[in-house]
Regions:
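N-terminal intrinsically disordered, cationic/polar leader segments
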Residues: 2-134, 141-173
């Protein structure tokens, strides 16, 4: 049996209070955040979501003996909403098939609203690389939960190289 610890709980805070010297000039009372932060996420949300498994429950018999072929397509996009305010979207389509029979199809458009204050030449990489990197883990969890809740093994998407996607897009432009 463990001994009880009778040591008093310290009265000081575990996280120090910010003092005036830790706050950027011109930013009193904002918790130390600069008003011209290069990137801030204002919110994130599902814009569109669908899941289809048209051959359940019969497909479960096929899954006992065969592994489905899974094809995943990812695309990113961005749209200006106001000055320094951008909506960034990741679209993902995942399709599982055994031969020509659809096991499941899921599509999601996951988005975030970002305030971005960077030089114009840096805007493209921030919108199409940095912002999707922030959104991707949340979208990945939704897809995993959705396929698992659909009665299948959860689909765990591999990390996406958004920098390579961006470079590919620039070469095609």
């Amino acid at each position: 049996m463990a001994e009880e610890d009778d040591s008093p709980i310290p009265e000081e805070r575990f996280t120090p209070e910010p003092d005036a010297s830790s706050s950027p000039e011109g930013a009193p009372g904002n918790g130390g955040l600069d008003e011209d932060v290069a990137l801030a996420i204002n919110g994130q949300y599902i814009k569109d979501l669908s899941f289809e498994a048209p051959h359940t429950p019969e497909i479960y018999n096929d899954l006992q003996t065969e592994m489905p072929e899974i094809k995943v397509d990812i695309d990113v996009g961005a749209e200006a909403k106001a000055e320094s305010l951008f909506e960034v979207m990741i679209k993902c389509r995942a399709e599982a098939r055994i031969d020509d029979k659809l096991v499941y199809l899921t599509e999601i458009e996951y988005a975030g609203l970002f305030t971005i204050n960077v030089e114009p030449e840096a805007l493209g990489p921030v919108l199409l690389i940095e912002c999707p990197l922030i959104l991707f883990p949340f979208m990945r969890r939704i897809i995993s939960d959705l396929t698992g809740d659909g009665g299948f093994a959860p689909l765990m998407l591999s990390p996406i190289d958004f920098a390579a996607l961006y470079q590919q897009r620039m070469m095609q432009a």
